[in-house]
């Protein structure tokens, strides 16, 4: 074998993030988008133990109750999930029936250990969502750049670990720190 160098660190203890959810028309097909990232059916990465908030206050969501389940268009998943309309905790049935009339809409999920493959979808219309990876995830989906990345962030320490797949052309990658970093190290994972 050859010589190897490794860096090992932990960027944060518990993942968590708030995603702003909107519905976008892609050539006549409504799809969910996150944080204004203009790509449909993205696969979300949510770390086990992390708490994530999905904010559906935008008017484009009014008739599209955002749901999480174990199948692409159904089978509601409830472990670790709390639904809120206008700041009040609701059952899933109350959430979907009162969704359109609410001013503020939130879905909170604390991803349990060994959570199954999950999906996000609209409870009223099929084909609007995508997959959620939970097992062995090393961070949370980040839509701050021109390409999607996964970031493990400790903003108070000023440190993040970001993974992404390049496109072969110029792109920007979000780091999740909220301020411009002073330095960064980039290592290609497929180089010998």
Question: How should these model regions be labeled?
Answer:
Residues 1-16, 137-192:
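Surface-exposed molecular-recognition determinants
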Residues 6-10, 45, 51-55, 108-110, ...:
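Residues within well-ordered beta-strands of beta-sheet-rich folds
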Residues 11-15, 25-29, 57-62, 70-75, ...:
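Acidic glycine-/aspartate-rich tracts in secreted/extracellular proteins
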Residues 21, 60-63, 85-138:
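Extracellular/periplasmic metallocenter environments
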Residues 22-48:
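N-terminal edge beta-strand
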Residues 43-49, 114, 174-180:
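Extracellular/lumenal carbohydrate-interaction signature centered on repeated Trp-anchored short motifs
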Residues 47-49, 104, 167-171:
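Solvent-exposed, conformationally flexible loop/turn segments
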Residues 62-88:
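N-terminal V-set
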């Amino acid at each position: 074998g050859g010589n190897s160098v490794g860096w090992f660190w932990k960027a944060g203890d518990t993942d968590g993030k708030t995603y702003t959810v909107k519905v976008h028309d892609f050539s006549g097909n409504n799809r969910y988008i996150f944080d204004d990232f203009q790509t449909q059916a993205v696969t979300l990465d949510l770390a086990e133990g992390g708490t994530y908030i999905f904010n559906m206050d935008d008017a484009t969501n009014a008739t599209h109750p955002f749901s999480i389940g174990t199948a692409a268009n159904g089978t509601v998943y409830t472990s670790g999930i709390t639904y809120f309309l206008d700041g009040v905790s609701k059952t899933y049935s109350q959430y979907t029936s009162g969704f359109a009339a609410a001013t503020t809409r939130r879905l909170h999920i604390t991803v349990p250990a060994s959570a199954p493959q999950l999906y996000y979808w609209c409870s009223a219309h099929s084909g609007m969502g995508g997959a959620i990876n939970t097992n062995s995830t090393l961070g949370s989906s980040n839509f701050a750049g021109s390409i999607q990345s996964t970031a493990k962030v400790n903003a108070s320490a000023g440190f993040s670990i970001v993974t992404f797949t390049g496109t072969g052309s110029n792109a920007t990658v979000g780091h999740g720190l909220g301020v411009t970093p002073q330095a960064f190290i980039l290592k290609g994972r497929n180089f010998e």
